[in-house]
Amino acid sequence: GLGDVYKRQIYEYTGDKTFRELAEKNTFKLYPLKQKGTDHDLGFQMNCSFGNAYRITGEQKYLEPIHTSARVLAGRFSPVTGVIRSWDFVRKGRDWKYPVIIDNMMNLEHLYNAGLLFGDDTLKSVAVTHANTTLCNHFRPDFTSYHLVDYDPADGRVRRKETVQGFSDESAWARGQAWALYGYTMMFRLSGYECYLNQAENIAGMLLERLPDDGIPYWDFDSDRIPDDLRDASAAAIMASAFVDLSSLTNKPEEKGRYLKMAEKQLRTLASDAYLARPGENGNFLLMHSVGSRPDNHEIDVPLTYADYYFLEALLKYSRTTQTKPNNN
């Protein structure tokens, strides 16, 4: 699982083959997931494991599950709606027909990379179309994102816009904003389409204005309990990784420094005693104080796997970008 991805990230940073061997030992336990067409997170799961494994090692054994899973994921796309369906379930009291969540942007890296690897333009087209449709429908005028947009599968019409895991439908759920920043930064990096860079910069500008002084967002920017509410370390880690990338991609010199400075601030705070657990504590996770879904009372103020993953990813990117190692000084 993602625990093995951590080992691969540590290998990438240190060059210690022990960690590479530990990661490879268990990666193929995820092999059956390649056919799991009922889960929109398939791209996220396979890119973080098999995708990273191939990127780092170049070994051919990782290619088949990458291609198969990408094509299975593309099967969740509808040309009528122009997006990949997220959830197959309907919650009590909700009348969703074709729900799409902002988190789904994180699956596009797997699709686009597979399209490049295998010369499969259909996969790239699905990724681009999903990103374009989401850009049109998920965002408010202030560049904050809804969590969920529900479409009519018959004609593609937007039926409703909600924020299921946030404070209210019109609130800015922190991790949703992180997925949005990361997703459009990533799509520009892969495709070179300027509209994605513009969107990423607009989202980044909104975040720079609204983030607390230490860089760690409250679980929802519009919670009515600020400043006494919970922070979300996972959102900060995702943002930090995206901010590092965006600092290298932007054409605006004045913004480059602002993005990198925010990433460094977030990483320093996450690496402080307030968020970084001591060895052997916190269930052996790195980061404390993430929030899964406050409205569902699920994963409240706990460690989360993807918080650790993006924290390590952000540290690696920061190290490459600045040729330094972050510390607490």
Labelled PLM ranges:
Residues 18-37, 66-85, 126-144, 152-163, ...:
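Long, well-ordered core segments of solenoidal/helical folds
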Residues 1-6:
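Short, small-residue-biased leader/transition segments that mark boundaries at the very start
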Residues 10, 44-59, 85-103, 143-172, ...:
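Carbohydrate-binding/catalytic loop surfaces
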